[in-house]
Amino acid sequence: MKKAQKANAERERLEKIIVAVLKASREDLDVSRAELADRLGWKPEQIAELEIGRRIVRAADLILIARALGIEPEKLFHRVMRW
């Protein structure tokens, strides 16, 4: 496998983990997609798109979502790295 292919495969793997951690964190806190969207000023569909992988989670989104859930962003990053 070429370096670029390996990098893309690793990126896709990490994106899936990030999405899984965000969704699990939201569900652990018993926060609905609609409630999280409201806290962020987003539409519930935007949360759904993130959680099903149709939208890439940018670093800024990750930080905003963590704050909206009342979680320190560092803890989310740590959870991603342990997944």
List where the protein language model places each region.
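Residue-level signal for the short linker/turn that defines the boundary of a DNA-recognition helix
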Residues: A20, D30-V31, V57-A60
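Short, basic-rich loop-to-helix N-cap that marks the start of a DNA-contacting helix
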Residues: R54-R67
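Short alpha-helical DNA-recognition segment
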Residues: D30-I52
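N-terminal flexible/basic segments that precede or flank functional cores
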Residues: M1-A24, D28-L29, R67, E72-H78, ...
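Residues within the helices of the helix-turn-helix
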Residues: K23-A24, A34, E45, I63
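The DNA-recognition helices of helix-turn-helix-type DNA-binding domains
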Residues: K43, R54, V80-W83
